[in-house]
Amino acid sequence: MPAILEARINKKRLLISTDTKELQIQLINKDIPNVLDSLGLNGKVSYGYIKGKNNYICIDRLEAYIDDYESQNPTKGELLSLIFLKRLVEGGKYGDIEEINYSVFDNFKEISTHLRNVSCDPNMCRPKKCKKDCLYKNRIEELKEEHITVVNHSLLAKWPYKDEKPLENIIVDEAHNLTEKGYDFFSSIINSKSLRYLLQEIYPYEFIQNSSFIYKKYSRNMRKIKAFDKFYNVLKIEREDKQKIARSINLIIEEIDSILNFGNCNEYNNVSNYNLRWELNLQIDEIVGKLKKDGVDTEISYRAYSEKIKLSCEKIIKNLVSIIIIIYRNIDDDSIDKEADIYKFGKAKTRDLEDIKIIFEIFLEYDEKDDYARIVEIDKNYNDFEFRVVPLKIADLFEENILSQLEKGIFLSATLSLSESMSYFKNTLGIDRVKNVEKIIEPIFDYKNRVSVVGFSDICEYRNSEFPNEMSKIISNISKITEGHTLALFNSKDRQEKTYEILKKYLHSFNLEIYADKKGIRHLNDLNRKCVVLGSKGCFEGVDIPGDGLVCVTLDKLPNLNPKDPLYFTIMKKYSIDYYTINYPQMTIKVKQAMGRILRSKYDYGCFVIFDVGTNLSVLKRLEKDLHDCKISKVNSNEFYTYIRRHLNKSRSLILKSVIFDTIKALNVDAKMDNNDVDKDIIKKDINENIRQRAVKGEVYHIDIIKKDMKVKYFDRNYLINLDIFMREEDKN
């Protein structure tokens, strides 16, 4: 509403930033239209959303791709999927890859491969010069006049559309995510798969037979002349130099493979079931795990792997330099048309190579006093790796890239404050350095009475192998009491998958549905279905199920940071910050987000169950204050079911009173009965429809017009309500 009023009254153009693309879509399809409708401003305030270039189909690339495919004997499935894409983008209304319905991917198996080859190339796509009628170009044009543009935080951090829409007035929703994801936004990343793809793009066509790329399953596309080959021709690079480039690329690929093979063929392959993650220098002697050698437990550290990575990176840098030198030797020739598209494309790709070289160089630098973490992550199956250079002082970068450009900024979230202060949020992002006003709004919901927070005193801790079994039994018993409508959240994907496999056997025997991921969320809205949804970190926010659709949220454990997490380990080490200071804000934000799934509207209530709350009483006491003074009750598993039944019955009694009062008022039932101006069957039907619209399962099954009595069934309880007495008492309240 503030954005709409500011746009309408003061003629301001604003950005609204959300955490995810799903929330973008919710704002565009639901929230903004509803507010405009309620204010009578439909058609008077323009709005839309935009994503990064690579989220859109490029018509030029699609047409070239189709032409190439026609000469390569494509299969029927490949042709049909290409025809679908061609028709999709006609007219410039469609072309957002993420908006393609999942059923399309089910019916056209080849479409994912096609989309990788036809999305907008950031180096080639220049909307101002594009003559095609494409969605992305149209959206860029609309930005110039659009009142409200919705983006996600990732795009906001690097906002590439400053010419069309400057960063002057922004509203940031779910702003708490910036404190954690800010490190990702400003990181420099080398991903081995992305690097391979870039090297594949620049590999000279005439020597492709000597490369490893020719043996890939998609080698058909490697046997064609690529755009970069045309760039080589524009630069008049000699065959001998192209051969040197090919040789350097081969050597880089060898080093990429050797980094992965080092782990796969050595002792590291047997010490962990998870991705290997460590800070290249500060955790070099951290223990990965133990192996038995000659009957003796031997500790394995990251030292050997770190040394191998450093050696390979030095060789990769050397070969990148060799490629860049050859290209730049010819790039400034006066005879070259520097305005040609192919020249600009090639130069941009060469700059990408330079950027990668610089990241490798910074990754290898080591200074205990600098403000970076150098993080290695190796895929557990040794198929991929990622090197990250992460800036630790994101306040400087946030101020430079965002705050310094703002006229006004509003940062919103239900979880910005900790211990009744926003200091953590403001200090992390540098907002404390600029003029700001802090406003903490008291919650509109009665958390203490509507939400019961429960932990267990007698089940095993999360590290125990029996933990998924114990959780599954409890969740299945909860689901019988709640008739489904339960969301089980997990900090660990592995634990989520194990629990799903156990829990589905219990639930199927009770005729309860179970869904393994967030795709099942929409089924919770159907009050006639009895379902349980398991979700990971993506479900901690953005889940909005009103009323009886969601009455229980469970959490496997308090989401504490791993003290050996490379980023936070580095922060603690370099700045002498203790674990509690680092962990508590992050943990509390996540718990508040999880609990916040329950109370979303006037008729919401429920139980928030944390299976492993830990043993630190001082942390739990502080957490209670941050959970709106909700007491965390630790009970044994035998008492638990009586405890939640009592809470649910008490809450439902309050909900029923509220929904009946609002329904009677909305339909003017009291006055109609007084005037004897009502058919009891019609009014009963109208009341029940109104109650269901409020996402409540209560049902009026009998009405006595003369006595003004109603009999209502709500779950397993029946209520007799006399409207005269009821409305009089509720009006007093």
Predicted regions and their residues:
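A substrate-engagement module of RecA-like helicase motors
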Residues: 11-14, 18-147, 207-243, 250, ...
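Conserved RecA-like P-loop NTPase helicase motor core
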Residues: 458-464, 520-614
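Conserved helicase motor "Helicase C" RecA-like lobe of SF1/SF2 P-loop NTPases
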Residues: 493-516
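Conserved RecA-like ASCE P-loop NTPase motor core of nucleic-acid helicases/translocases
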Residues: 13-20, 410-412, 484-491, 495
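Signature of the SF2 helicase/ATPase Hel1-core->accessory helical subdomain module
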Residues: 22-25, 29-30, 129-145, 153-304, ...
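N-terminal targeting/trafficking signals and adjacent low-complexity tails
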Residues: 609, 613-663, 670
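Conserved interdomain hinge at the start of the Helicase C-terminal
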Residues: 459-487
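A contiguous, basic/glycine-rich beta-loop/short-helix subdomain that forms a polymer-engagement track
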Residues: 122-146, 157-160, 313-454, 517-518, ...
